C-alpha cells in the first residue's frame, strides 16, 4: 500500500462519520494485539484547550529526555500531524505500512469510522516506537470517544463549554458528564474547569470512582509565574494545568523544574494564537470555533495587541454558533473579509456578510468567493488576523505556503483529499 492509497482508504472510512461507542475500537485494537496495554497515557478532554495542554505536556516531557507520543486532531495541513513521536509527524511511509497491517487484520464484519481506525493506527505507531508517555487527546466528548479504550496514569479535563451540542447534549452539565466519562476508577483526574455546574459533575463522578480530583483554580494559575510561549491568559491556564499534571506524575516521569520551564518556554502549537511576520505584515492565526474560544481570542488580542485593530479574515462552519461568534469578533477589527471553508458545512460568505450587517457590527465587510481571493484582499494590510475554524486556519497556512516553527506544515504534501479527512459528520446507521 502506498501513502496515497493509505490516505484514500482513510478518506473512504469517513463516510461512516461519528459512531458513538467503544466496541469497534476495542475489537480493532485486539486484532493487532492491544498495543495500548504496552503504553502509558495522559488522557486529555475538554471543549477548548485540550490540544494546547497536550502540547505543553509533550514539550515538558521531551525537555526532560522522555520519548513522547502525541495524538491530536484535527490536522491543519498534513495527516501526520495527528500522530507524532518526539514531536515529529508520522512519516507517510510508516502510515501506509500501519494502515495496511490494520486493514489486513481487521475483523471482516467490522466497519470502523475514520477516527476509530486512526486511533488504533496511533496506538500501533506509539507501541512500535516504544514511547515513554503518550499525550492522548479525545476527539469528541469522552465517554464514548474512541480514545477511551485506554487506562491512563491521569485524566485531564481542560474546560467545559457549549460545542457539539447535537452529540454531547444541550447543557453544560450534560456535556460535562460526557467529558467526565474519561475518568477511570482510582485514576487521578485534574481539571481547570471553572463553571460551577460543570465542576460539580466532574467532582461527583470522581467520588463515585474513588478518583483523586485536583482542581486547578485561578489562585493556582496566579502562582504559576514561569514564562509561557503561547499567547493569551487562557494559555496560562492550560500551562498551569499541564505543570500540575507533570508534578503529580513525577513518580512515573521525573521532571525537574528546569525542564518544566524549558518545556513551557518552547511549546509550539500551530493555529492557536500563532503569530508570524511576512515582510511588513503581522499575521495572527487562531482556530477559535465556539463562543468560549472566540472570547478567549478577543481577550488575548486585547492583551497582546492593545493598540492595534487587525483586518480580520473569517471562515466559519454552519454547525457552530457562527452568528454569535462573528458579531462578537467584529468590534475588535478595523474591517472584515469573509470567505468559505472548503467543507459542505461552510457558512457562505454572502450569508455571513448579511448577518454581520444585520447585527449592525459597524465595520465594513467584504465577501470573497475563495480563500485565495480573501488573501489577495489583505495583501497590503499591516496586521491580519485569521480565525473562525481550525479547518480554515489550515487552508490559510497552506495557501500562504507558511512553514510553521514546529515544522509541521508542509504545503507540498497537502491536498483536498487530506483536508476532507478533517470532516466530522453524523454516522449513517450500520
Language model features: what each stretch is:
Residues 140-146, 151-210, 322:
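Conserved catalytic-core segment of NTP-binding enzymes
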Residues 44, 52-69:
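A conserved segment at the C-terminal end of the G1
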Residues 341-345, 407-430:
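Short, flexible loop segments at boundaries between secondary-structure elements
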Residues 16-18, 22-38, 63-150, 166-168, ...:
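ATP-dependent carboxylate-amine ligase catalytic core
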Residues 373-401:
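A glycine-rich beta-strand to alpha-helix segment
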Residues 192-214, 218, 282-283, 291, ...:
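C-terminal helical cap/extension that packs against the catalytic core
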Residues 38, 133-138, 145-156, 160-161, ...:
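Nucleotide phosphate-binding/pyrophosphate-handling subdomain across enzymes
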Residues 1-16:
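Charged, amphipathic alpha-helical linker segments immediately N-terminal to NTP-binding catalytic cores
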Amino acid at each position: 500500500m502506498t501513502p496515497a492509497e493509505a490516505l484514500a482508504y482513510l478518506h473512504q472510512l469517513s463516510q461512516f462519520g461519528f459512531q458513538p461507542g467503544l466496541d469497534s475500537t476495542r475489537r480493532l485494537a485486539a486484532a493487532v494485539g492491544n498495543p495500548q496495554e504496552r503504553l502509558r497515557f495522559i488522557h486529555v478532554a475538554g471543549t477548548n484547550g485540550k490540544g494546547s495542554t497536550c502540547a505543553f505536556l509533550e514539550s515538558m516531557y521531551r525537555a526532560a529526555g522522555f520519548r513522547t507520543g502525541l495524538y491530536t486532531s484535527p490536522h491543519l495541513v498534513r495527516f501526520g500531524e495527528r500522530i507524532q513521536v518526539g514531536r515529529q509527524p508520522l512519516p507517510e511511509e510508516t502510515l501506509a505500512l500501519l494502515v495496511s497491517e490494520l486493514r489486513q487484520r481487521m475483523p471482516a464484519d467490522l466497519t470502523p469510522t475514520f477516527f476509530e481506525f486512526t486511533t488504533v493506527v496511533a496506538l500501533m505507531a506509539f507501541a512500535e516506537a516504544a514511547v515513554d508517555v503518550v499525550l492522548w487527546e479525545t476527539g469528541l466528548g469522552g465517554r464514548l470517544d474512541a480514545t477511551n479504550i485506554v487506562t491512563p496514569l491521569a485524566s485531564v479535563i481542560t474546560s467545559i463549554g457549549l460545542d457539539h451540542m447535537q452529540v454531547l447534549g444541550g447543557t453544560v452539565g450534560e456535556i460535562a458528564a460526557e467529558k467526565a466519562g474519561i475518568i477511570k476508577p482510582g485514576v487521578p483526574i485534574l481539571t481547570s474547569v471553572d463553571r460551577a455546574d460543570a465542576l460539580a459533575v466532574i467532582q461527583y463522578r470522581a467520588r463515585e470512582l474513588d478518583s483523586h480530583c485536583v482542581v486547578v483554580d485561578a489562585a493556582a494559575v496566579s502562582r504559576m509565574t514561569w514564562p509561557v510561549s503561547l499567547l493569551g491568559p487562557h494559555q496560562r491556564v492550560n500551562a498551569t494545568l499541564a505543570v500540575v499534571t507533570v508534578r503529580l506524575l513525577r513518580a512515573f516521569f521525573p521532571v525537574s523544574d528546569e525542564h518544566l520551564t524549558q518545556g513551557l518556554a518552547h511549546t509550539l502549537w500551530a493555529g492557536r494564537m500563532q503569530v508570524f511576520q511576512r515582510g511588513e505584515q503581522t499575521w495572527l492565526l487562531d482556530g477559535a470555533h465556539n463562543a468560549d474560544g472566540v472570547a478567549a481570542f478577543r481577550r488575548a488580542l486585547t492583551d497582546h495587541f492593545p493598540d492595534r485593530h487587525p483586518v480580520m479574515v473569517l471562515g466559519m462552519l454552519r454547525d457552530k454558533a457562527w452568528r454569535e461568534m462573528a458579531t462578537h469578533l467584529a468590534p475588535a477589527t478595523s474591517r472584515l473579509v469573509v470567505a468559505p471553508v472548503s467543507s459542505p458545512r461552510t457558512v457562505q460568505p454572502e450569508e455571513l456578510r448579511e448577518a454581520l450587517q444585520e447585527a449592525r457590527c459597524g465595520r465594513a465587510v467584504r465577501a470573497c468567493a475563495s480563500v485565495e481571493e480573501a488573501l489577495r484582499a489583505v495583501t497590503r494590510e499591516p496586521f491580519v488576523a485569521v480565525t473562525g475554524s481550525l479547518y480554515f486556519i489550515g487552508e490559510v497556512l497552506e495557501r500562504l505556503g507558511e512553514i510553521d516553527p514546529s515544522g509541521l506544515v508542509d504545503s507540498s504534501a497537502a491536498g483536498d483529499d487530506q483536508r476532507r479527512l478533517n470532516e466530522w459528520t453524523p454516522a449513517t446507521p450500520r
